[in-house]
């Protein structure tokens, strides 16, 4: 299930983004400040390039690129 980012409380959204950008595998080899990485993801959400996916079975949220979401989920 896709969750519109604007429906989350600001603090919840920030924590979700921070969790995403600090995970293993998201490091691009450069020393980019946390604030910059959070801002980039927040802007991608605002532009609709990234989405929040909620998995009911696991009760987990994850950030995904829109291009990776099945088209039928976007309708």
UniProtKB/Swiss-Prot annotation:
It comes from the Bacteria. HAMAP family: UPF0270. This is UPF0270 protein Avin_35000. InterPro entries: UPF0270, YehU-like_sf. It comes from Azotobacter vinelandii (strain DJ / ATCC BAA-1303). Belongs to the UPF0270 family. Coiled coil: none annotated.
């Amino acid at each position: 299930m896709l969750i519109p980012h604007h429906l989350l409380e600001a603090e919840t959204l920030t924590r979700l983004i921070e969790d995403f950008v600090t995970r293993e595998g998201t490091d691009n080899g450069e020393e980019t400040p946390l604030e910059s990485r959070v801002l980039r993801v927040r802007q991608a959400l605002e532009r609709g390039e990234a989405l929040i996916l909620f998995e009911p079975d696991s009760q987990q949220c994850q950030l995904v690129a829109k291009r990776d979401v099945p088209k039928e989920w976007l309708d």
